[in-house]
Amino acid sequence: MVRPVQVGNKTRMSFAKIDEVLEMPDLIEVQKKSYKWFLEEGLREVFREISPIESFTGNLALEFVDYRLENNPKYSVEECKDRDTTYAVPMKVKVRLTNRETGEIKESEVFMGDFPLMTEKGTFIINGAERVIVSQLVRSPGVYYEQQFDKFGKKLISATVIPNRGAWLEYEEDSNDIVYVRIDRTRKVPITVLLRALGYSTDIQILDLLGEEEKLKATLDKDTTKSEEEALIEIYKRLRPGEPPTVESAKSLLYALFFDAKRYDLAKVGRYKFNKKLALKTRIANLKSAKKIVNPVTGEILVEEGEKISKEKAEEIQNCGINVVEVLVEGKVVKVIGNNTVDINKYPMPYDVSSLNIKEAVNLSVLKEILDNFSDEEAVINEIKNRMDELVPKHITKDDIIATISYQLNLTHGIGSIDDIDHLGNRRLRSVGELLQNQFRIGLARLERVVKERMTIQDVNEITPQNLINIRPVVAAIREFFGSSQLSQFMDQTNPLAELTHKRRVSALGPGGLSRERAGFEVRDVHYSHYGRICPIETPEGPNIGLIGSLTTYARVNEYGFIEAPYRRVDKTTGTVTDEIVYMTADEEDEYIIAQANEPLDENNRFINEKVVCRLKEEIIAVPPTEVDFMDVSPKQIVSVATSMIPFLENDDANRALMGSNMQRQAVPLIKPEAPIIGTGIEYKAAVDSGVVVLAKNDGVVEKVAADKVVIRTKDGRRDEYNLLKFKRSNQGTCINQRPIVNEGDEVKKGQVICDGPSTDYGELALGKNVLVGFMPWEGYNYEDAILISEELVRDDSLTSIHIEEYDAEARDTKLGPEEITREIPNVGEDALKDLDERGIIRIGAEVTAGDILVGKVTPKGETELTAEERLLRAIFGEKAREVRDTSLRVPHGESGIVVDVKVYSRENGDELPPGVNQMVRVFVAQKRKISVGDKMAGRHGNKGVISRILPVEDMPFLPDGTPLQICLNPLGVPSRMNIGQVLEVHLGLVAKALGWQIATPVFDGATEEDIQELLAKSGFSPDGKVQLYDGRTGEPFDNKVTVGYMYMLKLHHLVDDKMHARSTGPYSLVTQQPLGGKAQFGGQRFGEMEVWALEAYGAAHTLQEILTVKSDDVSGRVKTYEAIVKGENIPEPGIPESFKVLVKELQSLALDVKVITEDNQEIPLKEFEDDDDSDVPDATLNINIEGREDTPPEEVYEESYEEGFEEEIEELPEDIDFEPDSFDIENDDLDLEDFDI
């Protein structure tokens, strides 16, 4: 039943019944492997494609011979983050320039820009920010056939030939049996026109080629062209309408579109999919042959007439070089034409070419040519090497096109299969390496243009590779990709799980992928081929649902970009499950019958049940053990990492499991992390692979342990030093802090966890806290999923987290002179400067609140023209104090904390700074946030809620032994949500705490209800897991018993401190003059259309009037009102709202004559309310930016008006009113006349 299992440094009691046959792979291998491929092979491929670059005359050629990346980056990863630079190494390329006329060769090494490096953790540091490149799920290149039905129910077949890049070919049929082709999405032409253009010019040749097909005859009747030339011209007219067509230009266009490797690329995967789909062996298997089939090489009879062709025979027929087979279908003879490829290792020839390691099928005609011309084994092998691009062409071939047409015609007779484009056999992953390679290719293509131009312009004798090559386009392409591609994302670093999941994310969006609007239901849905590849649970809620997924725990990506899942092979002869692991792609898996991982086996690994429940494609079937081909490796293999961390997942509703998976990623790291009592056994693996913990590089003994450093003496006497990260800010503002968990003198093994990171506890992922919960209502504070918590959690800092904010101040050069960072700030008292050092920068350890100065900075003000007397006095008595204004960096509204770090960068010290910046100061302020009312918490089962009240410990309900509950949850949150996993977790948590166990209950293989009941009884609890509770206020028992136990609760990154916001005055929108909205803009609260209705319904006329005028966009009225409030006078009459003026202006712009008429038919001249604005109210002194000049920060408005002589007005205002708006991010101002914002 339960057995102890060692997990890292801990022992957990595991309920798993299934032994793990396969170790879980490295979870960020997707990223690392792909990038490694790019550096070693991807780059070489691109250089090989593009070289040589030849001049237009052909007498100069530039070749890229080799490349290398230097070993040492200029700065370490941490330094790059501090300095806002990119973690990169220089790339040097060896270039050879050949002058073919003189035979002169110049070779040199050219610098090709800095190339971003991937860190150990699978991320990139770009301009100091850690970013992740998300893998993209796209349609694989290949041939896809689908069927529709016309209005009479007739089956119409259409096909699409999709390359990696290049022109598409689309075939379609109409109800009259005519087959059309569209070339590159232009107007359609009969398919026979394309065949004629390819060289089959007469009707007889076409019918000979493809057989006497009804559809072909109907199409020939429709076809108006009668020769190759006419067909070429017809196609040219479609592709280039309006250009004068000639046969030559048509020929070269057709060649360029399909048969030029530079313009048309199938990629390795496209060639593989073509050969798989169009090969004879899959198409003729299990059909009857219409003629006897003879091996053309040996002359032996392979299949007699009328005999059924087996799978093995079909493969033999293809590999001996037969490309056309006639089969019988319902008495008709049908011609099946392959794409003329053979498996070179099985083709009957006297030479052994296995050493060449050619995996792809090769073009038969090229192979025959090689074999005819050479007779010596070595010569044959060399020739095969040299002509690899022809043997396995990257572009489409004539044979391919004919085979695709043949397949289309065969489908009418039911030969072949229709494709499902949502099947994972037809979708592939483009990971970092390939995305980067494509970007690099674009850069090199631009570089090629520049080089060709320069070759023609420059003097041939003076040319060197250096002055031919301009690296800017290459560098720009790479920079653009990392900086602004949709797939290059700012890493989600809230906690280690968020990091890990982000690197394993799979997105169907992005360039070359789908768009949210166009993606239909089918693409988003779970497909049976996702099994073991993409998690059916973890995907976002909202517009991206189903378009963004997550790789499952055991999935891996093969060389073609298809996702593979592992299976154990079953020995059919004995019915024994072996330990041999086979990785299969989705389309390979379709051919086999696969048993579940939890199918019971005896001690000899044989199936116990007489009927085994298995999967075959999308069906669930029961078969005898002898028919099973494979068995799942682990029950976890169908879900992602985050989902496999939910205990009792099998008892949760899928929608709630989805929320649970997503919310674990939002848990903030707590000060005292605590691993879950009820885990699933994957916590250790997740923490280690996320890269936040420190692992020992070698065996050894711990020599020294400090808070920020661990030293280990290895066996051979070397010292390994590990520097730890202390209180660093993550991308999301959470705290990254590592702490040692070993002591001096401890022996450590290689790969052992020696330091915990954020949200880890002895090497295990620890996202939350184990708290004592009771499912009971308490005075209505549980209404609508609200959570009642005990003050104990606040007092003990159980749910306290540290958040770090970063503030930057830059001293720039302005037109009036440089800004200066200084302690001498005008009009600021000494008490405001008490924590600044002599440079004017805050000291580390200072406690700051909103409005405090972090960095003192002054900016020069415009000098006024001096009179002659002043100039004279200036000359005699020396420089008067320079005119400067205070532009210090202050703590924004609502923020506070302790300064934990200050970094100063300046030009003088040789730091790299942006142009125009002389000095930069970066201040880090840390906040300790205790759990508070309004914070969001959640369990792991999608059970989320907001804290409604924090109750004193003595008022909380308590257990018979006096232990008070820590949290009360609403029992009504369970039944309708159907996430029963939380109840089982609570019961098991109660027992585990009593026994002092840590438990592992893996998904789909965990503790059962019986196990839990047995343990409850063993520990002396009631079998229903309920306990009598007592009211903390009165001490009286509650009427009913209550389910009590330990649940793992997370504090989520939706904290009330980040959402609280209040405004008195602040920025206004430019056109409507209404306050902006949102906390970031320091905006007001929107009083929308429906809210106005509510006031109208109650006849609250005065309230309504002031909301629509002085509280919103009556420009002069609001200033007068503010002044009236400050001076304690009565509020004046409202004026005319700005929106009304805008409306009038809009109507006038439509050339309408607008008149404003009062109740008693008096016309108000429109002039009047335009003069309103020139009121005598000193609006600027109140920093109510009336002209809506959002380009001027508030300080500047204030200063200008100050000079205009409003001193006395200002003195009357009380000191404690703060007019400083938070920030001036102006959103686009949409005019909505029905809604007024206040």
From Swiss-Prot:
One of its GO terms (cellular component) is DNA-directed RNA polymerase complex. SUPFAM superfamilies: beta and beta-prime subunits of DNA dependent RNA-polymerase. Disulfide bonds: none annotated. It catalyses: RNA(n) + a ribonucleoside 5'-triphosphate = RNA(n+1) + diphosphate. Its EC number is 2.7.7.6. The keyword Ubl conjugation does not apply. Residues 1193-1238 have a biased composition (Acidic residues). GO terms for molecular function: DNA binding; DNA-directed RNA polymerase activity; ribonucleoside binding. Residues 1187-1238 are annotated as: Disordered. GO terms for biological process: DNA-templated transcription. It comes from the Bacteria. Keywords: DNA-directed RNA polymerase, Nucleotidyltransferase, Transcription, Transferase. The RNAP catalytic core consists of 2 alpha, 1 beta, 1 beta' and 1 omega subunit. When a sigma factor is associated with the core the holoenzyme is formed, which can initiate transcription. DNA-dependent RNA polymerase catalyzes the transcription of DNA into RNA using the four ribonucleoside triphosphates as substrates. Belongs to the RNA polymerase beta chain family. NCBIfam families: PRK00405.1, rpoB. This is DNA-directed RNA polymerase subunit beta. The lineage of its organism: Bacteria, Bacillati, Bacillota, Clostridia, Thermoanaerobacterales. The gene is rpoB.
